[in-house]
Design a protein with these regions (language model features):
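Catalytic cores of large soluble enzymes that bind and process phosphate-bearing ligands
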Residues: 13, 68, 156
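Amphipathic alpha-helical interaction elements
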Residues: 26, 65-69, 125, 205
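Metal-dependent phosphoesterase signature
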Residues: 58-94
Length: 225
């Protein structure tokens, strides 16, 4: 028995969930929705110049989410269902099979991603994966069920390690995982931002690697998938 973390973009999903989200938004967003996004994009550009590419991505993600402000939970669910319908052809079917193998061995599966949680929930349902724990970026809602347009903590890089460790502590306290599972952690992911997670894992597995990431895997004697 083990804990198995699986990244989403570029790993379980071969594409980029933000790109397809942007495609849907171009059809669904009104001019009013785009106003805060455009303002936020300017701030993201400044952040990118000062702090680099990853900082730009995070700020743009936050800006984009502001276009969701005022939408109901039902409207958001419909939006993410359209995302899944557009992106489902990019699912990594071989990795789906590997996940099911892990489950047959009694392993605990965590889908760990910076992607939005409602999208991942819809995706997992579409590909018929069951008993999956999801740690990802959340959208916040007002008590009346209307989206605030604000994100929770963006789960990326070192943040993934912190979130997994918090989840493990909570799950152990609640009796959801055994001490035996804590002795074996797997990590399936694809990018350089996942290197901290790979170092946490007993079994790092680099999925769909770029040439540069493949070399990193070889240098560290990590498995390839």
């Amino acid at each position: 028995m083990a804990i198995v973390t699986v990244d989403f973009d570029g790993t379980l999903y071969k594409g980029d969930s933000f790109k397809i989200m942007f495609q849907i938004a171009k059809k669904e967003y009104t001019r009013k929705d785009w106003v805060p996004v455009t303002v936020g994009l300017g701030k993201a550009g400044i952040s990118g110049i000062i702090n680099g590419k990853n900082a730009f991505k995070k700020e743009f993600f936050k800006a984009f989410a502001k276009g969701f402000r005022g939408k109901t939970k039902q409207e958001m669910d419909t939006f993410f269902e359209k995302l899944v319908d557009l992106g489902k052809k990019e699912v990594h079917t071989e990795l789906i099979d590997r996940i099911k193998e892990h489950q047959s061995n009694g392993d605990t599966i965590i889908l760990l991603s910076g992607a939005l949680q409602p999208f991942l929930e819809a995706f997992v349902k579409e590909v018929a994966l069951k008993d999956i724990h999801i740690i990802s970026t959340t959208l916040t809602y007002y008590p009346n069920g209307v989206c605030t347009g604000e994100l929770g903590n963006i789960v990326n890089g070192e943040g993934k390690v912190a979130e997994v460790q918090k989840w493990i502590m909570r799950a152990k306290k609640e009796g959801l995982i055994s001490n035996e599972e804590l002795n074996e952690i797997w990590a399936y992911a694809d990018s350089e931002t996942d290197i901290p997670l790979f170092h946490l894992a007993d079994h790092p597995v680099v999925v769909n690697p770029t040439p540069a990431m493949k070399q990193v895997a070889v240098n560290n004697a990590w498995s390839l998938f």
